[in-house]
């Protein structure tokens, strides 16, 4: 058993959830600081982003289905060992209610997309934002399949934004 799994197993669900939510708050705050330091703050940042609910929902749904299909394919093609993230995902979602899962995923999506797409990609470009996104998921760095998957997903999300179709950050 790895040290990471030992640490994870030693945490209560409450501690784990607090840690996960704090990491998302940290990403949002870093994004806010970067928006003010590198740009003109929230107002100009948000007005520079497109807001097209119809196309965003339609194309976002197609993108999500495609990503789920690729995810299923990855799980069929690669060994369980190459996809083991130390049990974090299973531990995080195992005890959550479906409503809590939806809420948590929305928080993660908002905070991470705010930092990496709305802020970092706007100022530093797609390659840097995508690599930083992949490295933030540091537990995947030693797992080439997972790291590559997250990097490709990040690039795909960045290209999605480049096409100017985004709902919110």
Q: Each predicted region: which residue ranges?
A:
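Charged interaction patches that mediate protein-protein contacts
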Residues: 11, 15, 19-20, 161-168
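Membrane-embedded alpha-helical segments of multi-pass transporters/permeases
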Residues: 32-36, 138
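Transmembrane helix-loop-helix hairpins at the membrane interface
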Residues: 81, 93-169
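Alpha-helical transmembrane segments of multipass membrane proteins
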Residues: 26-31, 63-71, 112, 129, ...
């Amino acid at each position: 058993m790895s040290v990471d799994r030992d640490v994870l197993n030693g945490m209560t669900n409450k501690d784990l959830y607090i840690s996960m939510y704090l990491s998302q708050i940290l990403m949002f705050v870093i994004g806010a600081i970067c928006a003010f330091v590198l740009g003109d703050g929230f107002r100009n940042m948000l007005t520079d982003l497109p807001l097209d609910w119809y196309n965003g929902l339609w194309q976002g749904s197609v993108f999500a289905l495609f990503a789920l299909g690729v995810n299923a394919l990855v799980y069929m093609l690669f060994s369980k060992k190459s996809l083991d993230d130390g049990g974090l995902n299973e531990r995080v979602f195992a005890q959550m209610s479906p409503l809590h899962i939806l809420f948590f995923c929305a928080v993660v999506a908002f905070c991470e997309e705010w930092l990496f797409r709305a802020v970092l990609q706007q100022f530093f470009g797609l390659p840097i934002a995508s690599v930083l996104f992949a490295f933030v998921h540091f537990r995947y760095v030693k797992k080439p399949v997972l790291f590559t998957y997250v990097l490709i997903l990040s690039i795909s999300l960045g290209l999605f934004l480049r096409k100017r179709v985004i709902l919110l950050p």
